[in-house]
């Protein structure tokens, strides 16, 4: 029988399976994406059931599976994020964050920056009701792009290297572009450009502010970057 292993993970999604089990999609600290089955957790007397809810951060003991599905044999709560579950806006933003990680990071290779980013996002949404904003959610996505290796070029034209007159964005080129390279691009305001740069370098809790018009451009830039380079389509941030 395979030896059990321990890891810490965030529950991204939970799906009912059979009469009493659940299939879990997890993102772990040291093993990347993990699929697992938690047997019997939907029974009333199960001690693990309440610890394996989506958005929870948990310390797990798992038994190695033959394929991609491991078996949960033990679970302890690290952070259940109880307060964000009481606020619709916070819950929606947290669910969006977990969905983005689920769709973008499908490898079993560990990505500690991405894991730490997700944990920070959930903790922030749990503790700060005012954090559940469009601007903050887009800042998380920009940082996730960076952690996944898909951050766009923002310092110079992604096509030719020009550093002035940068007023458009092209996902196919890889970022911001100059007038001479703007075929297939869309206009990007200076405010939206500043937001994109600031979102990468500033802490999540201190994300840049921007108008709704600029945030719409940011959302489009992130979405098109994901679609073109990662072949992932996420629901736009409203």
What do these predicted ranges mean?
Residues 1-238:
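Non-catalytic alpha-helical scaffolds and adjoining flexible linkers that form interface surfaces
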């Amino acid at each position: 029988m395979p030896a059990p292993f321990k890891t810490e993970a965030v529950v991204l999604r939970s799906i009912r399976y059979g009469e009493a089990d659940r299939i879990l999609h997890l993102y772990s600290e040291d093993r990347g994406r993990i699929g697992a089955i938690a047997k019997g957790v939907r029974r009333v007397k199960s001690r693990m059931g309440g610890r394996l809810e989506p958005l929870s951060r948990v310390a797990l003991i798992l038994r190695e599976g033959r394929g991609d599905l491991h078996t949960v044999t033990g679970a302890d709560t690290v952070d259940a994020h109880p307060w964000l579950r009481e606020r619709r806006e916070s819950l929606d933003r947290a669910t969006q964050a977990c969905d983005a990680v689920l769709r973008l990071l499908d490898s079993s290779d560990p990505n500690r920056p991405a894991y730490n980013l997700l944990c920070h996002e959930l903790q922030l949404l749990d503790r700060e009701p005012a954090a559940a904003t469009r601007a903050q959610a887009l800042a998380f996505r920009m940082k996730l792009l960076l952690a996944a290796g898909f951050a766009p070029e923002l310092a110079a034209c992604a096509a030719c290297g020009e550093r002035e007159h940068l007023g458009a964005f092209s996902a196919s080129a890889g970022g911001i572009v100059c007038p001479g390279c703007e075929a297939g691009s869309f206009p990007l305001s200076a405010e939206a450009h500043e937001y994109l740069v600031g979102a990468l370098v500033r802490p999540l809790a201190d994300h840049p502010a921007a108008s709704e018009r600029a945030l719409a451009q940011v959302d489009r830039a992130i979405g098109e970057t994901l679609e073109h380079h990662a072949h992932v389509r996420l629901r736009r941030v409203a």
